[in-house]
């Protein structure tokens, strides 16, 4: 491994850390790809390629998985209504949320809450 590749790898790690920190701070908001790309001063197309090459997933998939993990936490630790939880964690389309939730957890939010309590 050359010194240049080590430097590039470290720079990419720092850039990923910055965009992940941004995502964790703003995931409740409607984050556009251009917003995330701007944190690294990149064009959205370059950002998408950079993120996928360095994480193995698209930025949108990462963002939605992060949001789903937060919804999961609230489902099993609070009695809040589902619509409140979704709103709190940045989901605005219930139909899309249900599809993603079922794909990820193979159940509905209500059933999961019942099973884990």
Predicted region positions:
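…primarily DNA-binding HTH/wHTH and HhH modules…
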Residues: 98-117
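The short coil/loop that forms the "turn" connecting the two helices of the helix-turn-helix
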Residues: 42, 91-92, 107
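An amphipathic alpha-helical interaction segment
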Residues: 1-7, 11-14, 42-48
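Short, structured helix-loop boundary elements
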Residues: 9, 13-16, 33, 37
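Terminal helix-turn-helix DNA-binding modules in bacterial transcription factors
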Residues: 17-25, 30-34, 53-93, 114-117
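Short hydrophobic/aromatic patch on the recognition helix
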Residues: 46-47, 51, 96-97, 101
């Amino acid at each position: 491994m050359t010194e240049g590749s080590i430097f590039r790898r470290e720079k990419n790690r720092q850039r990923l850390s910055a965009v992940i920190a941004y995502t964790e701070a703003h995931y409740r908001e409607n984050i556009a790809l251009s917003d995330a790309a701007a944190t690294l001063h990149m064009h959205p197309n370059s950002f998408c390629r950079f993120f996928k090459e360095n994480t193995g997933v698209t930025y949108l998939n990462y963002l939605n998985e992060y949001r789903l993990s937060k919804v999961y936490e609230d489902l099993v630790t609070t009695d809040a209504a589902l619509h409140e939880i979704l709103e709190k964690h940045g989901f605005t389309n219930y139909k899309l949320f249900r599809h993603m939730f079922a794909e990820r957890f193979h159940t509905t939010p209500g059933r999961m809450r019942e099973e884990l309590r």
